[in-house]
């Protein structure tokens, strides 16, 4: 499974790129897993509130489609999961749950928009259960990099640039005033990933 944090779900749906993400990863929506609280965070039970939260009906439709198809992240009892016992105040409960779920299932990967959590995780040294997670962590910029490389570039660029308020860094990568070329977008996304690699003391694994 690909575990998705709530930030990534929100932004990917706001860009209307959910199906492009699945295609880039070579999976269906049933290969995703989301936090149980996601549907409440995005107000999906109330269409008007969900549109207010996500910005468009299409974004709401994609979020609902994802929640209907995806698994819910489940974590075993705290005593059995060493990740939950790390007690880092700079890793919020949602990200801690996702890291713990990664520990539970070796084949899963996590796509997260929370760089602070990655940086906090990188400050935990000499803990084998943490060290083995890095190869399975994917940041939002890497997810966008995968989409750009597998989907029609102009189609993806138009979707991102129609929703520049969603994420400043992604918007800059694709070009705010005028559209950037594919090479410029890939270079910008690679630069953001390299920065995260540096800020995690080289632990974030570059693609």
Where in this protein do the model-derived segments appear?
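Active-site-proximal, substrate-binding regions of enzyme catalytic domains
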Residues: 1-108, 115-207
């Amino acid at each position: 499974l690909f575990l998705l944090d709530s930030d990534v779900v929100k932004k990917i749906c706001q860009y209307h790129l959910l199906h492009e993400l699945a295609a880039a990863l070579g999976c269906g929506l049933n290969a995703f897993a989301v936090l149980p609280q996601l549907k409440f965070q995005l107000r999906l039970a109330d269409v008007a509130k969900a549109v207010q939260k996500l910005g468009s009906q299409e974004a709401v439709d994609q979020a609902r489609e994802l929640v209907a198809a995806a698994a819910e992240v489940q974590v075993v009892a705290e005593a059995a999961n060493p990740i939950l016992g790390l007690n880092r105040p700079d890793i919020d409960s949602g990200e801690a749950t996702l890291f713990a779920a990664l520990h539970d299932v070796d084949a899963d990967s996590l796509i997260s928009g929370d760089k602070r959590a990655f940086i906090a995780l990188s400050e935990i040294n000499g803990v084998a259960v943490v060290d083995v997670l890095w190869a399975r962590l994917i940041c939002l910029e890497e997810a966008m990099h995968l989409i750009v490389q597998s989907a029609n570039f102009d189609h993806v660029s138009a979707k991102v640039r129609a929703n520049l308020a969603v994420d400043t860094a992604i918007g800059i990568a694709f070009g705010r005033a005028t559209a950037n070329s594919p090479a410029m977008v890939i270079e910008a996304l690679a630069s953001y990933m390299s920065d995260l690699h540096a800020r995690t003391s080289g632990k974030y694994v570059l693609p």
